[in-house]
């Protein structure tokens, strides 16, 4: 996408709170963030996003719209809710075994704002929408009184780690999430 097209797209972009009727789109985002975008969105995952007590609830999401369409989304929330919401969410995830759940590290802690899942649809990538969603999530955390934001970045995605570093995040520790190695990154 050229500079003029990027400028136009940014001028036509807005971020809004997700609504319950965004649940299927959020399920797509979560699959995309997990590099599973070739999977069909299941009714189970959509139902998880439609609930109000799960990690992936529409209440924890913001939607980026560009040119009148949903272009991407960010799921973020206070670490304070993580353990309770995880205990509800993970058993509902299709195909996830108890052994996988037990082997997954804690992603976030109380007292921090967690950026859980981010994805931008392919036709809207490289236009700054992902950065807008990240900065929006950081601002939401700050407005809620959190001074630290965290996220996980897959170790094998060096370009993502570099991107998050440019946005002010620093590697803090290593985490295992559903069998994959991640960096826990922090922005203070």
Model-derived regions, located:
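Conserved N-terminal entry element of GNAT/NAT acetyltransferase domains
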Residues: 1-21, 32, 188
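A short beta-loop-alpha structural element at the N-terminal edge
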Residues: 14-28, 39-40, 78-79
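Conserved GNAT-fold acetyl-CoA-binding loop/helix
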Residues: 31-50, 84, 90, 94-97
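Active-site rim helix/loop that mediates acceptor-substrate recognition in acyltransferases
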Residues: 40-61, 65-71, 75
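Conserved acyl-donor/pantetheine-binding loop and adjacent beta-alpha core of acyl/acetyltransferases
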Residues: 78-113, 117
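Conserved GNAT acetyl-CoA-binding A-motif
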Residues: 111-113, 125, 134, 141-153
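Conserved beta-strand-loop-alpha-helix junction that forms the acyl-donor binding cleft
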Residues: 116-125, 151-160, 176-182, 187-188
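Conserved active-site alpha-helix within GNAT-family acetyltransferase domains
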Residues: 127, 131-135, 143, 156-173, ...
